[in-house]
């Protein structure tokens, strides 16, 4: 086992990364090894997908399968060995199909089929023990003693960034949005990473390419969500329980939320969003469901306590899931799509009867709690509509600064930095937030500036796209570069989606971003220095010191 993809990873003087019997996230060594093997198989598929594409052969099933299966290897997504093995076997079948199609296309074109790299020729074992014995072939740091640590760090930056992009591709696909050109570039990068490079410049360029690719993916996902559910609107949301039977929907998949709402209509069940699903409450399409009553709980890391106290059924539509046995609710939590946990019921297809039956069998909430409301829904359309008013308030001096404070949440005590930063932001500043990092402060009162709320919740982590559109619009209005705006980005990272959002921002030329609370363990000190020199990227320090720098206070 070697896994170093999330903030929780082990850090010691002897080296970084989880490499023992179990990772800090709860992932067993065998699961980690199988995930590495799956990635290796997917890279082999992408080699053939790329070569076949050069001859005009495109398999749309493969184009959607590879990102989806890759998504299953993200932090806190799938801990079920049998599901990972099934993905690996499916990858082997797709690779063989593409191999045949490629060779046939070569014959038709009168070309000789190329000799492809080992990753495209690897023969997957037929049993779990055999697959585990093959794991060293796919170990991410297998050649660590032969290469410079910066090369390994750059490879991992690319791999983990591409994982985040794969997740957004799958979210878009669920909403009917795919793009053959995006899929082709995705395969090219997967294939490149499958034949480990030692060229630092090429790896760095690839990291920026991944950021550019993800910008297009986020635009595609934004289109999928707004075409399906309308543009988010400023919406007041209750964050306290109401009396009645209950289902909690977590993750990011709004299509699943829609299906659950349709199937629970008239059955006396209240539906709540959780975590990154909170922004769904701002979409017009969901406002017709009176039994979508609000948001319950906070960010992913608190779920073992919050789910244990939730007297209903829970559905995990995507990341993040952690051990449900700790809170003894494994019999009433259900997984979907790429999510998996051993022993937890997995819902296949669009029928949520098993979830509904479980919710009806449970007590539900016995009384209404006193409401606590928050306002959400300041995504792209709402921000653009407010832009003239915002500009007027900037010009008259009422608004002097903007902060984008968001990203992933986590359980490290150092993350209180983000709460303290939001609290300490000057009263003449506006705070934009997105991702589950918002839960560090989204229930606090920040007031307004001439009717403009000082806290603007943009949405999910992928709604960084909305923030980028606002920044571009403001830079055009003020006729300046984005980096000349009175805007500072402070991003909390935990896993791979945050990595690819960061790469997206860097690839667009956004500078002087702060990230925290701790830098990714796979980034060497030298790589961190290079990123600081090139982009002004730096780690958070203290709220007082960072605010002085951001506000140019001497």
Swiss-Prot record:
The keyword Cytoplasm applies. Hybrid [4Fe-2O-2S] cluster binds at residues 252, 276, 320, 408, 436, 461, 495, 497. InterPro entries: HCP/CODH, Hydroxylam_reduct, Prismane-like_a/b-sand, Prismane-like_sf, Prismane_a-bundle. Binds 1 [2Fe-2S] cluster. It comes from the Bacteria. Its cofactor is [2Fe-2S] cluster; hybrid [4Fe-2O-2S] cluster. GO terms for cellular component: cytoplasm. This is Hydroxylamine reductase. It comes from Shewanella sp. (strain MR-7). The lineage of its organism: Bacteria, Pseudomonadati, Pseudomonadota, Gammaproteobacteria, Alteromonadales. The gene is hcp.
């Amino acid at each position: 086992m070697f896994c170093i993809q999330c903030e929780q990873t082990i850090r010691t003087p002897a080296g970084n990364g989880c490499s023992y019997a179990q990772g800090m996230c709860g992932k067993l060594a065998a699961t980690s090894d199988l995930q590495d093997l799956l990635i290796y198989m997917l890279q082999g598929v992408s080699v053939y997908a790329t070569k076949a594409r050069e001859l005009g052969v495109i398999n749309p099933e493969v184009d959607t399968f590879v990102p989806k299966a890759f998504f299953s290897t993200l932090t806190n997504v799938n801990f079920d060995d049998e599901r990972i093995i099934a993905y690996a076997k499916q990858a082997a079948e797709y690779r063989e199909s593409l191999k045949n199609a490629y060779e046939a296309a070569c014959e038709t074109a009168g070309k000789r089929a190329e000799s492809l790299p080992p990753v495209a020729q690897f023969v997957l074992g037929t049993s779990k023990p055999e697959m585990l014995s093959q794991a060293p072939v796919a170990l991410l740091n297998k050649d660590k003693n032969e290469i410079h640590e910066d090369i390994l760090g750059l490879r991992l930056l690319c791999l983990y960034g591409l994982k985040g992009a794969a997740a957004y591709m799958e979210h878009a696909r669920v909403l009917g949005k795919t793009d053959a050109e995006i899929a082709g570039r995705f395969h090219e990068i997967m294939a490149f990473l499958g034949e480990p490079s030692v060229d630092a410049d090429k790896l760095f360029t690839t990291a920026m390419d991944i950021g550019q690719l993800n910008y297009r993916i986020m635009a595609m996902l934004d289109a999928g969500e707004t075409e399906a559910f309308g543009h988010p609107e400023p919406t007041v949301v209750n964050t306290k329980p109401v009396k009645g039977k209950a289902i909690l929907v977590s993750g990011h998949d709004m299509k699943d939320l829609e299906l659950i709402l349709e199937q629970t209509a008239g059955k006396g069940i209240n539906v709540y969003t959780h975590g990154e699903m909170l922004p769904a409450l701002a979409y017009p399409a969901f406002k017709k469901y009176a039994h979508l009553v609000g948001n319950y709980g906070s960010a992913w890391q608190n779920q073992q306590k919050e789910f244990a106290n939730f007297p209903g059924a829970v559905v995990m539509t995507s990341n993040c899931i952690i051990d449900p046995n700790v809170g003894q609710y494994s019999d009433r939590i259900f997984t979907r799509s790429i999510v998996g946990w051993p022993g937890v019921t997995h819902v296949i297809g669009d029928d949520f009867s098993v979830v509904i039956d479980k919710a009806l069998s449970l007590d539900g909430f016995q009384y209404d709690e006193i409401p606590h409301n928050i306002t959400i829904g300041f995504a792209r359309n709402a921000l653009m509509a407010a832009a003239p008013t915002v500009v007027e308030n900037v010009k008259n001096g009422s608004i002097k600064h903007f902060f984008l404070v968001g990203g992933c949440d986590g359980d490290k005590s150092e993350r209180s930095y983000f709460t303290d930063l939001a609290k300490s932001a000057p009263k003449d500043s506006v705070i934009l937030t997105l991702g589950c990092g918002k839960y560090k402060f989204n229930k606090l009162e920040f007031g307004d500036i001439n009717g403009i709320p000082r806290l603007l919740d943009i949405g999910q982590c992928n709604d960084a796209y909305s923030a980028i559109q606002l920044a571009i619009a403001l830079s055009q209005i003020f006729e300046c570069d984005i980096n000349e705006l009175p805007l500072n980005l402070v991003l909390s990272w935990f896993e791979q989606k945050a990595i690819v959002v960061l790469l997206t921002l860097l690839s667009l030329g956004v500078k002087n971003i702060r990230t925290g609370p701790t830098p990714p363990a796979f980034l060497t000190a030298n790589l961190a220095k290079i990123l600081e020199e090139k982009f002004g990227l730096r780690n958070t320090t203290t709220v007082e010191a960072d605010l002085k720098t951001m506000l140019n206070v001497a």
